[in-house]
Amino acid sequence: MANDNGIKHFIDLSTVPATELRAILEDAKARKARLKAGEVERPYAGKVLAMIFEKPSTRTRVSFDVGMRQLGGETIMLTGSEMQLGRSETIADTAKVLSRYVDAIMIRTTAHERMLELAEYATVPVINALTDDTHPCQIMADVLTYEEHRGPIKGKTFAWMGDGNNVLHSLVEAAARFDFNVNIATPKGSEPKSQYIDWARANGAGIMSTTDPEKAASGADCIVTDTWVSMGQEDHARGHNVFIPYQVNANLMAKADPKALFMHCLPAHRGEEVTDEVIDGPQAVVFDEAENRLHAQKAILAWCLQDRGLGA
């Protein structure tokens, strides 16, 4: 998404045109190949990425830090307690100040609205590294992972099991942008937000919703799940018993296509949303997903910065 000043923000998959998302994905593949071949790239030497964390993270922090460094740049980490974002200083003022110091801002926050407001007032690119509503960087890594293992994602069917959370919201947006289908199995009361489903369907995604996990898994090309309780939402969590039928185990995987993959953004609660047998099994690609956060996010950083005359 570009604002009125031509700044490219990576807000959601719905805010970036399909052609540009595909270009980012292909760039990620190319950058990964060059890295594996031992090539060194430093297009953003001297550039700085501010990383704002209101929610703790392992994969997001390390992958963005390493990615920016591999591109030649540097990072500075700011925690919510250090910044008091939107409390002691307005988000608008914070955005304007940070824009004078750094070349891009990455934010992992609890509130989607805070991320949107930061992007509204920043004069450098803002990247959504996770909000309670969406997780677009993760899904770009997932699409990359699927295509590495199984080829073009177009026309394939993903089956989601469990809570209708932020990862699912970005998955259905990706379905519209990359032309694949999503079967959603959630217990009543845990459905995804309707605005994301409505947008995906209006933009061509095939979305099926059910309370029956076996129906959703039937013939699917990929089974996806996440923790039953998202980080920071423990006080509002439903009892685990309602999710037990949605556990991804060998019996559920057997309902999918024999070549189906298993995905999970991690960290996983083994024995809850997924069994050891599945997550450690041959169909699981969870650690490839984790690695591909690095490559996808490097391509996202490059997409945000390229048109600002900051390297390639």
Swiss-Prot record:
PROSITE patterns associated with the record: CARBAMOYLTRANSFERASE
Binding site for carbamoyl phosphate: 57-60, 84, 108, 135-138, 265-266, 293
Domain of life: Bacteria
Keywords annotated in UniProt: Amino-acid biosynthesis, Arginine biosynthesis, Cytoplasm, Transferase
Enzyme Commission code(s) on record: 2.1.3.3
Substrates-to-products reaction catalysed: carbamoyl phosphate + L-ornithine = L-citrulline + phosphate + H(+)
Single GO MF annotation: amino acid binding
Enzyme class: transferase
Entries under SUPFAM superfamilies matching the protein: Aspartate/ornithine carbamoyltransferase
Gene Ontology biological-process annotations: arginine biosynthetic process via ornithine; citrulline biosynthetic process; L-arginine biosynthetic process
Binding-site residues for L-ornithine, renumbered to this chain: 166, 226, 230-231
Pfam families recorded: OTCace, OTCace_N
Gene Ontology CC annotations of this record: cytoplasm
Location relative to the cell: Cytoplasm
Pathway(s): Amino-acid biosynthesis; L-arginine biosynthesis; L-arginine from L-ornithine and carbamoyl phosphate: step 1/3
HAMAP family: OTCase
Recorded family membership: Belongs to the aspartate/ornithine carbamoyltransferase superfamily. OTCase family.
Function according to Swiss-Prot or TrEMBL: Reversibly catalyzes the transfer of the carbamoyl group from carbamoyl phosphate (CP) to the N(epsilon) atom of ornithine (ORN) to produce L-citrulline.
Protein name: Ornithine carbamoyltransferase
Organism: Brucella ovis (strain ATCC 25840 / 63/290 / NCTC 10512)
Gene this chain is encoded by: argF
